[in-house]
Amino acid sequence: FRSREAGRIVILGGDFNEPSHLDWTEATKDMRDHQGLVVPWHVSVMLEKDGFKDTYREIFPNPVTHPGLTCPADCKDIALEKLVWSPKADDRDRIDFIHYAPFEGLTLTDVCIIGPKGDILRGQRETEETSDPIMTPLGIWPTDHKAVLATFHLK
């Protein structure tokens, strides 16, 4: 945060291991085992209050049409039992993010998910149709998380 105060571009990305409040909304409370909950997840709320933008939600603001699920990803080369965390639940969520602090001359131009199209759903490998832009890997995908790729233009 000191870098931002010093006039530097700040881009923060990674596996946050926590969903976003922008995904657990009134519109999604009855989806993916959210159990009717609207949750103000701490990390995303804190980042938003500090002025950071969620790249995926900036391009795709609707979590119903573009959930952007990143975990658990179906890695065909990994035994299913190593990928399943909650075999009776739909625990798919978007927990991998790229956030950025607005900066003069910096424009977000595109964002996509990188990884396999399939997910782990209720202990099974599933591939559902999605409107999310997914760039599939050419080779073996090594993790149970999909990645996020954001493209920026800097003047």
Residue ranges and their predicted role:
Residues 2-11, 17-155:
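Metal-dependent phosphoester-hydrolase catalytic domains
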